Structure formats: C-alpha cells, structure tokens
C-alpha cells in the first residue's frame, strides 16, 4: 500500500446497517473512442463509528484497514448535512 492516503467525497445513499453507511461517489471518465465525458458512480461501504450520518449527507472518507470483507473506508468529516 502506498504512503498517500486516498480521500474521496460522496453522498450517503443508505444508513440501514449499524456503524456502516453506503456512499455513492461520482467521477467523470473520458470515453476512449468518442471523447465524451461520462459520469461513473461507485458504491463504497464506509465505517461510521458513532452512527452520525444521515441519508443524503455529503461526506469525506478515507481508505483505511479492512473492517470486513467489503468495508475498507472510514468516515473523516461530514461536509454538508441533508435537511
């Protein structure tokens, strides 16, 4: 693993699990043939120790040690709360 910490931002799409939130992060990728930028969405399972996130919040999260088979990201900060 490299020394650089990967930080990402995304919108919380599910808070159904205990201490875990599902986050959708969007990125733009250039199509190899046509050159148009296409929006890609990736789903991340993020560890939320205090269950402080709500659905619709925009959060910042970082890569960390594996908490489970699918959960390898940890909550850093809540950027914007959904009303």
UniProtKB/Swiss-Prot annotation:
Signal peptide: none annotated. Keywords: Ribonucleoprotein, Ribosomal protein, RNA-binding, rRNA-binding. GO terms for biological process: translation. The keyword Transcription does not apply. It holds the Pfam family Ribosomal_S17. GO terms for molecular function: rRNA binding; structural constituent of ribosome. InterPro entries: NA-bd_OB-fold, Ribosomal_uS17, Ribosomal_uS17_bact/chlr. One of its GO terms (cellular component) is cytosolic small ribosomal subunit. Part of the 30S ribosomal subunit. One of the primary rRNA binding proteins, it binds specifically to the 5'-end of 16S ribosomal RNA. Belongs to the universal ribosomal protein uS17 family. This is Small ribosomal subunit protein uS17. It comes from Francisella tularensis subsp. tularensis (strain SCHU S4 / Schu 4). The gene is rpsQ.
